[in-house]
Amino acid sequence: MHAGAIGPLPVPSKSGSEQLIRHASLYLLERSLVRKGFDELILSRNPNDWTGFGPALEQWIEDTGKNLGHAALCAAGLIDFDAIVIDGALPAKIREQIVAVAQRHFAGLDQRGIAPLKIVAGTIGADARAMGGAALSLMANFAIDRDVLFKEAI
């Protein structure tokens, strides 16, 4: 069971469209940093301090935010969400910058027929993926009211 596999969502590319995971993933930043001479484990060795990565990080933030904004539109076309939460194994400052880019890009897309939604930064960090998957499985198997997790507005 997936907590919501968004990696395969289509996003625009030079060749037409490709999967989101090929345009908004930490491995892309890692590859870019290695090409610039950084150690391949630099992100995992310094999970809370990504200063000094310069243009490689800035470009990754821009590309990732843009593609997550597009993915948010795709997802909102299928399900009415109150919010899209962007979280993961990255410093809070970087997460906030990605959210700002995603919000800006989303605002510029054609949203006709889409219920209004917010794009917000999560607060869980590196454990977000595991906790999201675990929560859905626990709710599906043990909750009396399976909708309780999704009733509160964000």
How should each PLM-predicted stretch be described?
Residues 11-154:
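ATP-binding/phosphotransfer module of carbohydrate and carboxylate kinases, centering on a glycine-rich
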